[in-house]
Regions:
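Catalytic cores of the polymerase beta-like nucleotidyltransferase superfamily
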Residues: 1-409
Length: 409
């Protein structure tokens, strides 16, 4: 029985990157042999075992054969005669198809180290096309390693395009698409993930609402980059550079979906695109089963982002109603996420990436003002329904004073 560290841990070890998850493959063993040594079986579809002490995953070396549609459509074969090379060839990329024994010797039958040196993401074999999930995985790797100059091999991108055109992507479950996409959104270059999907024709299959933004013009005085799709990815890039959370990144991604629905005769203006965007944002969230908290912020940013840009010119009552819709009294963290997303929208424009966005602090200061006015601050004779009415009155008056201070030269 021989044990090898495989996959991402070997890749990151060779790159000098930290890694936390370790996967092992066991060659020359049977399930009974591992069970007799105290390993606990956990795999339903194929033999995966937990180490009795470390609880790390150990999988018996296996081969696989395509037997159906999608990423579940495989039959697996495993016994003590399966060789390490046979197990590694079923993996997606050469840089993920390396193994290392306990002495530190690296086994690299498919040129993974060479591709690491040349910064190439390359498929191991033509069997790559048998698993549609690999389109998303490779796009995610492209996003993860963009900082280091990695590029997808032309022939691999061609295979990804073949998968996209084959209809196999339709077999991916919404949960799996969202799992890969949410992980990609948290990479430093999440925009590369979506650009890669577009480059291989997968974006229009998995995210047609986002794909349809490309080619839609905007007014150049507000959007020097002109193209709506380009703006969306530029705004997402801003969210990544600021290291904002998943909720903000997703909201930025879908904030302008309504622009794809603008009547042709109105272009390049996008009147009411905020309202038009609510339906496609809802459809994306429902289709992918996006968590409710993320959906809530995405809809809010879609509907209200222009109000944030106009914040300093809003009347006190209008500003108060905006803060109310943002649930300012119960969820200050949502207000913070909202202004973060809106700032990314404002800065995700060609040549305007570094311009100030004072509206963000203006909204946050206004939030603190209204939150600091509480029922116990009212005169004692105010009771019953009057309390709510007076709180609103006091808050709007405080916002009026706040606005006046900002308006003064």
């Amino acid at each position: 029985m021989q044990v090898y560290l495989v996959g991402g841990a070997v890749r990151d070890h060779l790159l000098g990157h930290p890694y936390h998850e370790k996967d092992y493959v066991v060659v020359g063993a049977t399930p009974e042999q591992l069970l007799s040594e105290g390993y606990q079986r956990v795999g339903k579809d194929f033999p995966v075992f937990l180490h009795p002490k470390t609880k790390e995953e150990y999988a018996l070396a296996r081969t696989e054969r395509k037997s159906g549609v999608g990423y579940h459509g495989f039959q697996f074969f495993t016994d003590s005669t399966v060789k390490l090379e046979e197990d590694l060839i079923r993996r997606d990329l050469t840089i993920n198809a390396m193994a290392m024994d306990e002495t530190g010797q690296v086994y690299d039958p498919y040129g993974g180290q060479k591709d690491l040196d040349q910064k190439i993401l390359r498929h191991v074999s033509d069997a790559f096309t048998e698993d549609p999930l690999r389109v998303l995985r490779v796009a995610r790797f492209a996003a993860r390693y963009a900082n280091y100059g990695f590029k997808i091999a032309d022939e691999t991108l061609q295979l990804m395009s073949e998968i996209a055109k084959s209809g196999e992507l339709d077999a991916l479950t919404p949960e799996r698409v969202w799992k890969e996409t949410s992980r990609a959104l948290m990479e430093d270059h999440a925009d590369i993930y979506f650009q890669t999907l577009r480059n291989c024709d997968a974006l229009k299959v998995l995210f047609p609402e986002i794909d349809s933004l490309f080619g839609i013009p905007q007014r150049p005085e507000y959007h020097p980059e002109i193209d709506c799709g380009v703006h969306t990815l530029m705004a997402l890039k801003q969210a990544c550079q600021a290291n904002y959370g998943l909720d903000v990144r997703f909201a930025v991604l879908v904030h302008d979906l309504g622009k794809a629905l603008t009547p042709t005769e109105e272009l390049p203006r996008h009147i009411m695109h905020e309202e038009r965007g609510l339906q496609p944002v809802t459809e994306v969230c429902d289709r992918l089963k996006v968590p409710s908290q993320l959906k809530s912020l995405a809809l809010t940013v879609c509907k209200e982002h222009l109000k944030c840009h106009q914040a300093k010119s809003l009347k006190p009552g209008t500003l108060w109603r905006l803060l109310q819709r943002l649930d300012v009294l119960r969820k200050p963290e949502k207000v913070e996420a909202f202004v973060q997303a809106c700032e990314c929208d404002a800065k995700g424009r060609l040549g305007l990436e570094d311009r100030p966005y004072p509206q963000a602090q203006y909204i946050l200061d206004a939030m603190q003002i209204v939150r600091n006015i509480r029922a116990q601050d009212l005169p004692e004779h105010i009771t019953g329904p009057e309390i709510g009415e007076m709180l609103i009155k006091y808050r709007i008056e405080a916002l009026a004073q706040f606005k006046q201070q900002h308006d003064e030269p």
